[in-house]
Amino acid sequence: MRQRADVEVGPLKSGLLFSYMQNFCALQTRLRRPSRTTELDTMDFKPFLTLQHFRPQGFAGDVLAPGASYNQTWNTMASKFNGRGGNRVETGKVLEAASESLKETVPLLQLVVRARHHPLLVFLVGLFLGTIYLLYRYWDCAVGCERRPDLKGPKGLPLIGNLMWALKNRDPLSYQVYAQQKYGYGNTHTLPGLGRLIDISRPDWIEHVQKIKFSNYVKGEQFHDQMRDVLGDGIFTSDGERWKMQRKVASRIFTVSSFKAIITQTIREDCALVEQLIETYARQGTVFNLQELYFKFTLSSFVKIAFSQDIKSLSEPDRPDTFGDAFNYAQKVLDMRFVQPWWKIAERFNETGRKMRAARKIVEEFTTNIVEARRKESEAMGEKSKPESSRKDLLDLFMAYRSSDGQRLSNQQLKDTILNLMIAGRDTTAEALSWMSWHMLTKPDVYDRIRHEIDATLEEEGEQAGLEIDYDVFEQHTAKLTTFQETLRLHPSIPKNIRRALQDDVLPNGGPRVRKGDLMLYSDWAMGRNPDIWGPDACEFKPSRWTDQETGSSIKYSQFQAHFFNGGPRLCLGQKLASYEVVQLIHHIFAKFDLELIDLGPGRSAGFGKVPDYLNSLTHPMKRPLMVKATLRCCKEGTR
């Protein structure tokens, strides 16, 4: 069937035909001139010769049709040239010159033409060449990362960088300490999907990133994408104006007036419920999980403070904590995603993804119930609103917020807010209480110092009044407060974090160059064990480091050295709440009870032998239960 030339032969053949005609005309002209043999020897015969590798076709106007063979066409052309008079050219010489050109042209053209009929061959060749290129460019780092010989760190594998290390490493925090000791500050790793990570676990570099160049370092879209299905657009995951709005609204609850009107009373009520539970366990001789009890306490008190709801986690302790279990699992999976670039695909099919979807459903139901109940309450009130003098919780403040164009927050935005605040209000404080209690129960000097402070308060203020600590004076309880601070130094509630650079930068004091898109990784857990920062006894648990031994006054370290409450514009809003909560609860428990650590054996509970293992998560929980047995104190003299 006859077809148009541009359809049949394609761009390559059409171009060669055009070149063919050009050289044909030039050849005619030169053959008519005398003594042009040398020009023929250097003439480009490739357009003629390449016609041999296409199906021979005759040219009729703008249509190609099957025609004579290559040799027939060439002989016809030579005869025409020789028959026009002038110097005659021997066909043999032309073919001899053409054959040399043919040797260079034929292999490449054969591959090109044959490839049209073998797309798989084209794909395989392209894949091979592409792989060679990628291996050459990324022979020691992950794809997408610039090679940085100026940075020290473990050598990566081609294309995947340090991914195998990340997958095999079951103790990433300890590894950070090791890497810093071996490669120094600013050591680097590369991971597919994440890019280049630079360890900046130094106070001056963290201050540069979190304060001096705050606007240049963000959580980033990738961080947000990994967290979105659970934490949404909350304060923990967001940047820019969205983060500013949430911080501004949330800050209104953490005022002195709020502490006196809401927070103090709520915490005292829940401390009394904890006391009742432990007394029941003590009378029954029951061994119980103290870490689990702390989680119930912080969840109950925070939900009351933030949302004015009693979820009865303390008044009905035997009821399954479905929300807590689901939320804990979700955080564990979110943390795993940082070293699994394929998590979106994997979670569609594996068991982790199935459990994650179930956990998200439970978490979603919990937050939906809180928001919808408050919406119905507001609708029932109609135009009436809470008087200015009445109690307003965090949810009230966020529901009252209006953007510059008058828009209120949607239900989904309110639910995102709830979950982000839940991490800050529930998880971090409960974990700090657990680690602090373990150190108290395994270090008699720490235990006795706190017990002495408690007894002094009870003796001065009376058995009943001495149990309650006013917000105005809680910082005077230095034994408990310094033990809490030392606990956070070695067991920070957020042990690791990242920031992504928006523009190129240079870290101060001889620090490395930072490229746009690089991730700054810092670990408060590693910094707490660094002798350069905390002295040769950095790994020892010493609450006395927070007190001036000569004056007895508290020592205030820089927020970028004692970084467990974060620093700069993102300094923790709830640090006063957490500190007061810990001081008040520890005071209540150890004024009434003696606690004994029960070691159920390796792998079953936190024991005496070594510091308990932690669970890899967004926060820093103990991996195993903190099992204890309580006995009632008959009198103040019954100390350890």
Swiss-Prot record:
Gene3D superfamilies from the UniProt entry: Cytochrome P450
Q: Which cofactor does it need?
A: heme
Q: Record-annotated residues binding heme? A: 572
Q: Which GO terms describe its biological process?
A: lipid metabolic process
Q: Where does it live in the cell?
A: Membrane
S-S bridge residues: none
- Report the induction information: Expression is strongly induced under conditions of nitrogen starvation. Expression is positively regulated by the cluster-specific transcription factor rua1 that recognizes and binds to the specific 5'-T/G-G/T-C-G-C-A-T-A/T-C/T-C/T-G/A-3' upstream activating sequence found in all promoters of the UA biosynthesis genes.
| Sequence intervals crossing the membrane | 120-139
Topology class, membrane: Single-pass membrane protein
Glycosylated sites: 71, 350
UniProt cross-references to InterPro entries, sorted A to Z:
Cyt_P450, Cyt_P450_CS, Cyt_P450_E_grp-I, Cyt_P450_sf
Keyword Heme carried by entry: yes
Q: What class of enzyme is it?
A: oxidoreductase
- GO cellular component: a single term: membrane
Under Enzyme Commission nomenclature, its number is 1.-.-.-
Question: Which UniProt key words apply to this protein?
Answer: Glycoprotein, Heme, Iron, Membrane, Metal-binding, Monooxygenase, Oxidoreductase, Transmembrane, Transmembrane helix
Question: Which pathway is it part of?
Answer: Secondary metabolite biosynthesis
Report, from the record, the phenotype seen after gene disruption.
Answer: Results in complete loss of ustilagic acid production.
Any GO MF annotation of the entry: iron ion binding
Any idea what job this protein has?
A: Cytochrome P450 monooxygenase; part of the gene cluster that mediates the biosynthesis of the glycolipid biosurfactant ustilagic acid (UA). UA is a secreted cellobiose glycolipid that is toxic for many microorganisms and confers biocontrol activity to U.maydis. UA consists of 15,16-dihydroxypalmitic or 2,15,16-trihydroxypalmitic acid, which is O-glycosidically linked to cellobiose at its terminal hydroxyl group. In addition, the cellobiose moiety is acetylated and acylated with a short-chain hydroxy fatty acid.
Q: Which family does it belong to?
A: Belongs to the cytochrome P450 family.
The molecule here is called Cytochrome P450 monooxygenase cyp1
**Gene encoding it?**
cyp1
